[in-house]
Regions:
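Ser/Thr/Pro-rich, low-complexity mucin-like regions
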Residues: 25-44
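Hydrophobic/aromatic beta-strand patches that form the interior of the parallel beta-sheet core
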Residues: 258, 282-284, 328, 348-350, ...
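Glycine-rich phosphate-binding loop and adjoining beta1-alpha1-beta2 segment
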Residues: 286-321
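A structured beta-alpha segment of the ubiquitous adenosine-cofactor-binding alpha/beta core
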Residues: 313-347, 353-355
Length: 504
């Protein structure tokens, strides 16, 4: 939804529609401009309108910088920022951004997560400055020599003094950045100015801090600068999750979840939990990624041969850097012993391994007083039906809902040829199912996990997702589950556990 009039049009979006609609839209914008220009118009309304779009107007006057900026956490106040680049990212993401932070350790930790290897910062330059604007500067962007006069009325005297000191101390650096946080509450937009020595080629990126023992410096103590604008991304929790209006994000930040199984179901569950703001994830899986996994796994060909838990750990650290993630490349039966502290601290365990020995082990621990909540989730063959058993109660035990071989007693599909496809290896098999169906079941499981982490519910739940059950017969199976309402192709059911049977 557009929040302002945006008199110049919506970014660079092409105009579409009928000729009449385009002309009417242009006339409407022109009429608004005329109305706002009249002596009788409200100066306050005009001021608010232009302030709302101030960044748009500044960007129209400043060319884009050759380098974007990644700000590692939003600073709490005005001050200098250290700047680092890493040439390895140039090959990985098609450009070499500048990483800004108040201290070098924050940048090093962040780059280590992104690159998957330790980064040594040798000489971080104080090439950035962060400041909060008290009021809005004029929408007419300043010339380089007018920058400080343009900013001065809109900064506190202390912030302005700090900015001048930083500018003088950093004048030997050929490319610098000033991050201007707009007026308003915490989390206001940031406009980033790039101050570059005029001797630099227009599209030349500078390298700072990593691998080079020296920083690039200007030839003169008072360089003649140019002004451009750098795209800026704030890589902190508040910004990354800013479009999720879940009121329980603070609760999720401290939550600890262990996901047992990083296959086609467990991996997307872990990804959903990370992107939902769960603060601490531990991933458990002993297996390696193979080519046959790629059709329905979130990992790709570059991870073939790697342990699934370790590969997903690296993937999530890179993609969602606000989450603390640990990999345990082992069977959960061993992890319960060797990594006991991780399980003792856990709030929730989600097991998606489709391995009855590991599932039974966790139910046994749950039945004798383990404090963590437990969700066992799996898909029936061909991923048209998925289930999750949720246990919040300390002494819950679902083992009796399964036969001795781990087959669920209340399944919704029957398959004369068997539930799994054997592989040419000792005891190895897989449950057939496409990536689309598994992904939908993963969303159901992740939603159940978030609910358990953010509520005080002590209920035991059986959640099932059913999709296109008519396809079961086409796949030579039999559907024996509940009928869907007329016109529905999918359905999710929530109810207490089914009747408990004693194990045979």
């Amino acid at each position: 939804m557009k929040t302002g009039l945006c008199l110049h049009g919506f970014q660079e979006k092409p105009v579409s529609g009928s000729p009449e609609a385009i002309v009417n839209d242009s006339l409407r914008r022109f009429a608004k401009i005329v109305q706002m220009s009249l002596p009788t118009s409200s100066s306050d309304a005009r001021k608010v309108e232009f302030e709302r779009e101030s960044m748009s107007y500044w960007k129209m006057q400043h060319r884009a910088s050759a380098q974007s900026v990644n700000l590692v956490q939003r600073p709490s106040g005005a001050g200098a920022l250290l700047a680092v680049t890493d040439p390895r990212l140039d090959r990985r993401i098609g450009g070499e951004p500048v990483w800004l932070a108040q201290n070098a350790d924050a940048i090093a930790s962040h780059l280590e997560a992104v690159l998957g290897q330790r980064v040594k910062i040798r000489d971080a330059a104080r090439a950035g400055f962060y400041v909060k604007l008290e009021t809005y500067p004029d929408i007419k962007a300043p010339l380089p020599g007018e920058l400080f006069d343009w900013l001065r009325p809109h900064l506190t005297s202390e912030s302005y003094s700090q900015l001048l000191s930083w500018f003088g101390e950093s004048c030997s650096i050929v490319s610098r950045w000033i991050a201007l946080e707009l007026p308003g509450d915490a989390g206001a937009p940031i406009y980033c100015l790039n101050l570059r020595d005029r001797s630099l080629a227009q599209n030349k990126a500078v390298k700072l801090g990593v691998r080079a023992g020296r920083r690039v410096k200007a030839k003169f103590s008072n360089p003649d600068i140019t002004l451009s604008q750098s795209a800026i991304n704030i890589l902190d929790r508040a910004e990354i999750l800013s479009r999720d209006r879940n009121s329980k994000l603070d609760v999720l930040a401290s939550a600890r979840v262990i996901v047992v199984g990083q296959g086609s179901l467990g991996a997307p569950v872990a990804l959903h939990l990370a992107r939902s703001g769960v603060g601490h994830l531990t991933l458990v899986d002993p297996d390696q990624l193979t080519a046959s996994n790629l059709g329905r796994h979130v990992l790709g060909a570059s991870d073939l041969g790697r342990n699934k838990a370790e590969a997903m750990c690296a993937r999530l650290r890179s993609d969602v850097p606000i989450v603390t993630i640990k990999a345990i490349p082992s069977y959960v039966e061993l992890a319960l012993i060797k990594n006991r502290e991780d399980f003792e601290k856990a709030d929730l365990i989600v097991v998606t391994s489709a391995d009855w020995e590991s599932e039974e082990t966790l139910w046994r621990a749950k039945s004798v007083g383990a404090s963590w909540k437990l969700i066992q989730a799996w898909s029936e063959p061909h991923a048209l039906v998925g289930h999750a058993l949720v246990a919040a109660d300390v002494s819950a035990d679902a083992k009796s809902l399964f036969e001795d071989n781990g087959r669920f007693r209340h399944k919704y599909t029957n398959w004369p040829r068997g539930d799994s496809v054997p592989l040419p290896a000792c005891g190895q098999s897989f449950i057939p199912g496409g990536g689309l169906g598994v992904s939908a079941i993963a969303s159901m499981v992740a939603a159940a996990a978030i609910e358990q982490l953010t509520s005080d519910s002590r209920d035991i739940l059986w959640i099932s997702r059913i999709s296109n059950p008519q396809r079961v017969s086409a796949l030579e199976g039999e559907y024996v589950g509940p009928e869907l309402p007329d016109g529905a192709t999918e359905m999710t059911l929530r109810r207490p556990w089914p009747e408990v049977f004693p194990n045979a």
